Regions:
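Conserved alpha-helical substructure of the radical SAM core
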Residues: 1-119, 133-134, 138-141, 153, ...
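Radical SAM enzyme [4Fe-4S]-AdoMet core and its adjacent flexible, acidic
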Residues: 6-7, 18, 33-34, 38-53, ...
C-alpha cells in the first residue's frame, strides 16, 4: 500500500479522545480505581485538558472522533463548549458522558453547538434508580432529564447501558422507555470483570456476559 493510500485509510477511522483528566463519579471498576494508586495519580497529574489546537488538528485529519475517557469524562474539560464549536459539521462525533454536574443552561449551549453531526451517549446503567449503584455520585435523575432535553433539541441520543447484576432485571422496561423517549438503547455486555469481591458482586448472570475479548454492544431503536 502506498503512503497516501495508507493515510486515507487511517483518516476514515474513528480515534478515541480522552479529552481531560477529570471525572466526578466514582465507578469502582474504572481505571482510576483498579490501577495502582500511585501510578494512576501520576497519570492524572501529568495529563490535563486537551488543547484546542490539538482538537483542531484531529478534526482536520480524522473523519470521526469518539470523546470517551479512560480516566476522565469529556464534559469536564474546562472549555468543552469550545471543543464542540470546533467540530466539522460534515463529519461525525460522539460524546460519551455520565452526564452529571452540568447545568441546564450549559446543556442548552452544548446541544445548540452539536447539531446532527454530534451524537450524545449518556452512560446510564439501568433506570435512574439503579445507575448510581455503580456510577457512584451520578445525578441520574438529572441526567435522564438532560437526555430528554437533547431529544427535544433534535440531538441523537444513545442510552449506554452497561449490564450489571443490579440492573439486568430492568432491560425489558428500558427497551420500552427508549422507544417512548426516542433514545437509541445500547446494551453493553462488559468484559471488565477482575476476580475480586467488588466485581463479583456487580457481575451479571451468564447470558449478559460478553463472549468476546471486547465488549458486546446491541442497539435498539436505531
Amino acid at each position: 500500500m502506498r503512503y497516501n493510500e495508507y493515510v486515507n485509510e487511517v483518516r476514515k477511522k474513528s480515534v478515541n479522545v480522552d479529552a481531560s483528566n477529570k471525572c466526578i463519579v466514582q465507578c469502582p471498576l474504572c481505571e482510576r480505581h483498579i490501577t495502582d494508586k500511585k501510578l494512576i495519580a501520576q497519570k492524572i497529574k501529568s495529563s490535563g485538558d486537551i488543547q484546542i489546537s490539538t482538537v483542531d488538528k484531529l478534526v482536520k485529519f480524522f473523519d470521526s472522533l469518539n470523546f470517551c475517557g479512560t480516566i476522565s469524562d469529556p464534559i469536564y474539560h474546562k472549555n468543552f463548549l469550545e471543543v464542540l464549536s470546533r467540530l466539522d459539521i460534515n463529519k461525525f462525533y460522539r460524546v460519551n458522558t455520565n452526564g452529571s454536574g452540568k447545568t441546564v443552561d450549559w446543556y442548552l449551549k452544548a446541544f445548540e453547538l452539536s447539531g446532527k453531526h454530534v451524537e450524545w451517549a449518556f452512560s446510564l446503567d439501568g433506570l435512574p434508580d439503579t445507575s448510581p449503584i455503580y456510577r457512584i455520585n451520578q445525578k441520574s435523575y438529572e441526567v435522564w432529564e438532560m437526555m430528554k432535553l437533547a431529544i427535544s433539541k433534535n440531538i441523537r441520543v444513545v442510552w449506554k447501558y452497561v449490564i450489571f447484576s443490579h440492573n439486568e432485571h430492568q432491560i425489558d422496561e428500558a427497551i420500552e422507555l427508549a422507544k417512548k423517549n426516542k433514545f437509541i438503547l445500547e446494551l453493553v455486555k462488559s468484559t471488565r470483570w477482575p476476580d475480586d469481591e467488588v466485581a463479583n458482586k456487580l457481575k451479571p448472570s451468564e447470558k449478559w456476559l460478553s463472549k468476546n475479548t471486547d465488549n458486546d454492544r446491541t442497539q435498539y431503536n436505531i
